[in-house]
């Protein structure tokens, strides 16, 4: 498919809403949109926000060029006045949001857009497309890193998704702690370390496994990783050490009972003097399989399909909702759906992570200035109360939303690799605040509650 502008990465109804609002005289009303998810997938204790940097780039590039306008004119859906407006469109509003790599929970307002209705409504699809995909990968990837317990993980799922999604997935995986990627485009654009040596096809190309191993070592050196399960694993390990010597970098297992094989291979390597040779496991791994292999003598994992497809939950269910807008009286009013199972809390919100010492205790999502003021009054009352627990003395609030765009201009301009490194650091710091017990396994209850009431928020530690 030919390259398309980010402006066409949208749904038609964004433009039909825009046209109808312009015709009704309401398109210029000041509006606040928020991105959030109503729930986490069952068993997920937290989510990880990824894709923010890509969203900011998409907003900056959101333009309708002449080819776009010709196509839209051919559809016959939009009138000439609307098309003329689209020709000059530039986002001129404000964006606040959670930093990329930050954790999120149900109802966390991970991104807030403020501007006119016509300014913000068109961005819904592209924002959700990026955040849902990248956060889906990051959320499961973080679980995999936890299950790996410090063993390095390589992202290697590029052959399982769309070519552009593969690059985004590698980026998201690196943010949550993956050590490297097999994807060269991610390495070139985002400076994610690239890794890879050979597949079974390389061994099968030669008349014997010995010829294949000798060719790879001659090209890559003795520190390379040899794939040893094409034929007979034990024979391949002996052959690998015979050719490379005890300084052989690593062997890779890609099939069979990885746990049992790794025990046998480790013993064999040690008996041959290759005590520093590492063992890497690949082959349809996910966080549950990695957890099962925790006691196996493995040194790292290569993870593909289950990572880049979100591990059974490809999207965290982010939605983009109008929560506040200007009325005919010129004042801002909270708005929200009341429908069953999809009700939304009106008003633009402020979010804080409540910490006791350095440990996360609650997600505070407070709607409107009145709710924030009420929380501050109640918090003060609690602090001076005779019933205040010692924990209160160690309590602080970490603001979660930061300005990203003001008046259509980026607040901070970072190159793509800098964005990714900053997000990687943010994720590591935020995850550490949860202080999860790795022995509990991947699944469990949501790590901290989301509190949306000022009085309840001030009393959550009592």
Question: Model-predicted segments: where are they?
Answer:
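Gly/Ser/Thr/Ala-enriched C-terminal appendages of enzymes
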Residues: 1-29, 43, 272, 277, ...
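Buried, small/hydrophobic-residue-enriched core segments of structured protein domains
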Residues: 1-29, 39-41, 77, 83-92, ...
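Extended boundary segments
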Residues: 20-78, 146
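A residue-level signal for beta-strand positions that form part of recognition/binding surfaces
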Residues: 32-34, 92, 153, 319, ...
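Residues that form generic nucleotide/phosphate-binding pockets
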Residues: 55-62, 71-72, 85, 130, ...
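Short coil/turn segments at secondary-structure boundaries
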Residues: 70-71, 139-143, 157, 439-446
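Contiguous mid-protein beta-loop-alpha structural module that forms a pocket-lining wall or clamp
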Residues: 280
């Amino acid at each position: 498919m030919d390259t398309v502008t980010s402006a066409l990465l949208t749904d038609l109804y964004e433009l039909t809403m825009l046209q109808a609002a312009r015709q009704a005289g309401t398109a210029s009303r000041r509006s606040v949109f928020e991105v959030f998810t109503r729930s986490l997938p069952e068993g997920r204790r937290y989510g990880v926000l990824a894709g923010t940097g890509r969203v900011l780039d998409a907003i900056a590039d959101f333009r309708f060029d002449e080819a776009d306008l010709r196509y839209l004119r051919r559809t016959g859906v939009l009138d000439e006045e609307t098309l003329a407006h689209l020709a000059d469109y530039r986002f001129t509003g404000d964006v606040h949001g959670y930093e990329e790599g930050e954790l999120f929970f149900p109802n966390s307002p991970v991104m807030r857009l403020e501007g006119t209705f016509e300014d913000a409504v068109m961005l819904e699809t592209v924002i959700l497309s990026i955040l849902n995909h990248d956060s889906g990968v990051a959320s499961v990837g973080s679980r995999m890193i936890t299950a790996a317990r410090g063993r390095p993980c390589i992202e290697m799922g590029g052959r399982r998704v769309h070519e552009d999604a593969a690059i985004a997935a590698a980026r998201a995986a690196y943010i949550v702690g993956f050590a490297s990627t097999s994807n060269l485009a991610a390495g070139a654009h985002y400076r994610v370390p690239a890794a890879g040596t050979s597949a079974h096809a390389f061994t099968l190309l030669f008349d014997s496994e010995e010829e294949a191993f000798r060719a790879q070592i001659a090209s890559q050196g003795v520190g390379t990783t040899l794939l040893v399960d094409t034929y007979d694993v034990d024979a391949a390990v002996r052959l690998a050490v015979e050719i490379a010597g005890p300084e052989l970098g690593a062997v890779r297992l890609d099939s069979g009972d990885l746990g049992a094989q790794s025990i046998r291979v480790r013993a064999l390597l040690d008996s041959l003097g290759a005590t520093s040779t590492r063992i890497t496991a690949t082959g349809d791994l996910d966080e549950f399989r990695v957890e099962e292999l925790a006691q196996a003598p493995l040194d790292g994992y290569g993870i593909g399909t289950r990572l880049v497809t979100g591990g059974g939950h490809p999207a965290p269910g982010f939605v983009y909702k109008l929560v506040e807008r200007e009325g005919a009286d010129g004042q801002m009013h909270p708005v929200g759906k009341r429908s069953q199972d999809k009700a939304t809390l009106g008003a633009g919100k402020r979010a804080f992570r409540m910490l006791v010492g350095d440990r996360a205790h609650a997600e505070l999502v407070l709607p409107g200035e009145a709710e924030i003021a009420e929380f501050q009054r109640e918090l003060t009352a609690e602090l001076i109360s005779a019933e205040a627990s010692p924990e209160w003395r160690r309590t602080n609030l970490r603001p979660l939303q930061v300005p990203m765009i003001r008046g259509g201009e980026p607040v901070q301009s970072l190159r793509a690799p800098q964005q990714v490194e900053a997000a990687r650091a943010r994720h590591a710091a935020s995850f550490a605040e949860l202080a999860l017990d790795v022995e509990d396994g991947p699944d469990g209850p949501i790590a901290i509650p989301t509190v949306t009431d000022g009085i309840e928020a001030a009393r959550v530690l009592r």
